[in-house]
Amino acid sequence: DFQPREPVNPLLFAMKKTKMMIEVQLTQEYTGESIHTCFMPFDDNMISLLRHPTENIVGIAGVSNVGDMKNWCGSEMTKANWYAFGKLASNLSLSKETIAREWLAKNFDTTDPRFINPMTRVLLESHEAVVRYMMPLGLHHIFAAGHHYGPEPWCNIKGGRDDWQPWYYHKADAQGLGFNRTYDGEFHDVQPGFGVNIGSGNARLYPDSLYNIYNKVETCPEQLLLWFHHVAWNHRMHNGETMWDALCHTYDQGVREAEAF
């Protein structure tokens, strides 16, 4: 549901006989509610899918809401995402930097490099910073229930749907953190231990080339680790840190990056 970082949806690989459009979100529902600067042109995986589409991927759509603010978009910098979507919809060969520089020059009516250069850097680095200080390492759905601007991983709305609750996704317990989406030979319905000791099987929905990467803790990209695995707090990351230390340091890195902007 438009989290700061998600793997490409497996439906794009599986629905071979159905024409599809890829939907992205211009409105920053989970990336600072159009208040935080978060420049989000398509990532390289999405660009690859769109540049070399199968016959059933026929277009793209952008989810957006205009508000009652003077600039429609919530904040001055949020407009960059609307502009980037329009540019990439018509020309996928454009680089993120080209779009950022062009938008800054047009929106602020200046070509002064003392402004364009540092603000281009802010735009290009902003998304990774947001991921780091909000939901790093594949963590997801830990936002507040009444709004999606800040975190509320402890949220547990009485009578609410389980799969709308943050705890359903982060699965934090004494052993570890993260949602187990691995495949053990069969797909499982929701039951005790689901998403922790019992994998949902979601990883098997991907082509073998991705399944073989995502399904193992050892090979899963660390930026998606907690999306696909329930990971022990003392699990050693590639840099030798425990998962807990890496999580704390990544949050801190994101905050420091945002402060530097």
Regions found by a protein language model. Give the residues of each.
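Active-site capping/gating regions of soluble enzymes
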Residues: D1-S64
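Catalytic domains of carbohydrate-active enzymes that cleave complex glycans
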Residues: P53-F261
